[in-house]
């Protein structure tokens, strides 16, 4: 099973009428470039989860069009910025298909540290907006196969 952890794309600095921060134009373009890259690499997932916050949901929507066409997006609890990683760590134990989770920092950095070092306080990776990380489980060990930041996919033409 592969687990794709995604930090939402760059959001507007100010909140909209509903009190949420939508993706900025740059954020949308970056996530679209990431989606094209993932599609070209053959990435497909059977589940996409998001935090419920607008910017994470928008990120999931853009990605799902190419890596999970027809798959319904699902909100998952306890993955907002300051949440503890324990809940998601427990949830992924029962997953057996390639899955994507769209969320926020510092949660995504702490979750990556937990998967790689067994400790969410370890300093393992820096996750910029729009970053996609691919983890794979071998026996009881998670490894990071790769990590792609938007500046690498922005200008690629397919």
Where are these regions (language model features)?
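Active-site-proximal alpha-helix that buttresses catalytic centers in soluble enzyme cores
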Residues: 2-79, 83-86, 90, 108, ...
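Non-DNA-binding regulatory cores of transcription-related proteins
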Residues: 98-100, 105-131
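Residue-level signal for well-ordered alpha-helical positions
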Residues: 62-63, 114-115, 138
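A polyampholytic, Gly/Pro-enriched intrinsically disordered region
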Residues: 92-102, 142-150
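Domain-level recognition of soluble alpha/beta enzyme cores
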Residues: 119-154
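Short aromatic-enriched loop/helix-cap "lid" or pocket-rim segments at secondary-structure transitions
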Residues: 17-18, 88, 146, 156-158
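Short, well-ordered coil/turn elements that cap or connect secondary structure elements
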Residues: 68-70, 96, 139
């Amino acid at each position: 099973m592969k687990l794709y952890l995604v930090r939402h794309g760059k959001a507007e600095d100010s909140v909209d009428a509903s009190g949420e921060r939508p993706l900025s134009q740059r954020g949308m373009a970056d996530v679209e470039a990431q989606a094209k890259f993932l599609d070209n690499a053959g990435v497909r997932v059977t589940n996409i989860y998001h935090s419920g916050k607008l910017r994470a949901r928008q990120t999931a929507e853009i990605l799902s069009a190419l890596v999970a066409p027809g798959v319904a997006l699902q909100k998952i609890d306890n993955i907002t910025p300051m949440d503890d990683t324990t809940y998601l760590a427990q949830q992924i134990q029962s997953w057996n298909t390639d899955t994507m989770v769209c969320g926020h920092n510092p949660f995504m950095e702490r979750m990556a540290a937990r998967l790689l070092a067994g400790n969410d306080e370890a300093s393992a990776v820096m996750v910029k907006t729009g970053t996609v990380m691919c983890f794979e489980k071998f026996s009881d060990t998670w490894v990071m196969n790769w990590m792609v930041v938007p500046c690498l996919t922005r200008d690629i033409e397919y």
